[in-house]
Structures are given as C-alpha cells and as structure tokens.
C-alpha cells in the first residue's frame, strides 16, 4: 500500500524527520553551492509504512514533512473533485 510523502518549503534541514523514519524513506542529499545538505525532494515512498514518525519529529510550526496515507491522499492534498 503506497503512501504519499511531501516535503514542504518550510523545511529547515534539521534532519529530525530523516532520523525518525524507521524505513529510511527520507534521505539527505548535497545542496548546490552549500556545505549543508537538504532532504531529497523525491522520497522513496514505496518503503513508507505510514507511521508518521517524521511528522512527529518535525520541529517547525507548519509541518515541513507530511505523510498522506493512501486513503486520504486525494482529499488531503486538495486533489479531490
């Protein structure tokens, strides 16, 4: 069962979500022209189990990473007709 994982622009690159994920869906990649890394824009969603630990670990006021479970994906992401 595939879930959608979305990384928003509010991400501060703290890596809390990356470390919280038990299945390594999220990963850090090099950021052009910077020593810091950023979260890869295309998470490996096929490994997502929908635990939402990444959401719980996010310290920003607006969750920078969101997991949309397969049954709520179209409604939550504003894709429903």
UniProtKB/Swiss-Prot annotation:
<dbReference type="GO" id="GO:0009522">
    <property type="term" value="C:photosystem I"/>
</dbReference>
<protein>
    <recommendedName>
        <fullName>Photosystem I iron-sulfur center</fullName>
        <ecNumber>1.97.1.12</ecNumber>
    </recommendedName>
</protein>
<keyword id="KW-0602">Photosynthesis</keyword>
<dbReference type="InterPro" id="IPR017900">
    <property type="entry name" value="4Fe4S_Fe_S_CS"/>
</dbReference>
<keyword id="KW-0408">Iron</keyword>
<comment type="subunit">
    <text>The eukaryotic PSI reaction center is composed of at least 11 subunits.</text>
</comment>
<feature type="binding site">
    <location>
        <position position="51"/>
    </location>
    <ligand>
        <name>[4Fe-4S] cluster 2</name>
    </ligand>
</feature>
<dbReference type="GO" id="GO:0009055">
    <property type="term" value="F:electron transfer activity"/>
</dbReference>
<dbReference type="GO" id="GO:0009535">
    <property type="term" value="C:chloroplast thylakoid membrane"/>
</dbReference>
<feature type="binding site">
    <location>
        <position position="17"/>
    </location>
    <ligand>
        <name>[4Fe-4S] cluster 1</name>
    </ligand>
</feature>
<dbReference type="InterPro" id="IPR050157">
    <property type="entry name" value="PSI_iron-sulfur_center"/>
</dbReference>
<dbReference type="GO" id="GO:0046872">
    <property type="term" value="F:metal ion binding"/>
</dbReference>
<dbReference type="InterPro" id="IPR017896">
    <property type="entry name" value="4Fe4S_Fe-S-bd"/>
</dbReference>
<keyword id="KW-0479">Metal-binding</keyword>
<dbReference type="GO" id="GO:0009773">
    <property type="term" value="P:photosynthetic electron transport in photosystem I"/>
</dbReference>
<dbReference type="GO" id="GO:0051539">
    <property type="term" value="F:4 iron, 4 sulfur cluster binding"/>
</dbReference>
<comment type="function">
    <text>Apoprotein for the two 4Fe-4S centers FA and FB of photosystem I (PSI); essential for photochemical activity. FB is the terminal electron acceptor of PSI, donating electrons to ferredoxin. The C-terminus interacts with PsaA/B/D and helps assemble the protein into the PSI complex. Required for binding of PsaD and PsaE to PSI. PSI is a plastocyanin-ferredoxin oxidoreductase, converting photonic excitation into a charge separation, which transfers an electron from the donor P700 chlorophyll pair to the spectroscopically characterized acceptors A0, A1, FX, FA and FB in turn.</text>
</comment>
<dbReference type="InterPro" id="IPR017491">
    <property type="entry name" value="PSI_PsaC"/>
</dbReference>
<keyword id="KW-0603">Photosystem I</keyword>
<dbReference type="Pfam" id="PF14697">
    <property type="entry name" value="Fer4_21"/>
</dbReference>
<keyword id="KW-0472">Membrane</keyword>
<keyword id="KW-0813">Transport</keyword>
<keyword id="KW-0150">Chloroplast</keyword>
<keyword id="KW-0793">Thylakoid</keyword>
<dbReference type="GO" id="GO:0016491">
    <property type="term" value="F:oxidoreductase activity"/>
</dbReference>
<keyword id="KW-0677">Repeat</keyword>
<feature type="binding site">
    <location>
        <position position="54"/>
    </location>
    <ligand>
        <name>[4Fe-4S] cluster 2</name>
    </ligand>
</feature>
<feature type="binding site">
    <location>
        <position position="11"/>
    </location>
    <ligand>
        <name>[4Fe-4S] cluster 1</name>
    </ligand>
</feature>
<keyword id="KW-0411">Iron-sulfur</keyword>
<feature type="domain" description="4Fe-4S ferredoxin-type 2">
    <location>
        <begin position="39"/>
        <end position="68"/>
    </location>
</feature>
<feature type="binding site">
    <location>
        <position position="21"/>
    </location>
    <ligand>
        <name>[4Fe-4S] cluster 2</name>
    </ligand>
</feature>
<keyword id="KW-0004">4Fe-4S</keyword>
<feature type="domain" description="4Fe-4S ferredoxin-type 1">
    <location>
        <begin position="2"/>
        <end position="31"/>
    </location>
</feature>
<feature type="binding site">
    <location>
        <position position="58"/>
    </location>
    <ligand>
        <name>[4Fe-4S] cluster 1</name>
    </ligand>
</feature>
<keyword id="KW-0249">Electron transport</keyword>
<keyword id="KW-0934">Plastid</keyword>
<keyword id="KW-0560">Oxidoreductase</keyword>
<feature type="binding site">
    <location>
        <position position="48"/>
    </location>
    <ligand>
        <name>[4Fe-4S] cluster 2</name>
    </ligand>
</feature>
<feature type="binding site">
    <location>
        <position position="14"/>
    </location>
    <ligand>
        <name>[4Fe-4S] cluster 1</name>
    </ligand>
</feature>
């Amino acid at each position: 069962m595939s879930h959608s994982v979305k990384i928003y622009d509010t991400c501060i690159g703290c890596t809390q979500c990356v470390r919280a994920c038990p299945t390594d869906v999220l990963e850090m990649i090099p950021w052009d022209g910077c020593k810091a890394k950023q979260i890869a824009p295309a998470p490996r969603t096929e490994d997502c189990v929908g635990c939402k630990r990444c959401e719980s670990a996010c310290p920003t006021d607006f969750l920078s990473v969101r997991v949309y479970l397969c049954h709520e994906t179209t409604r939550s992401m504003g894709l429903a007709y």
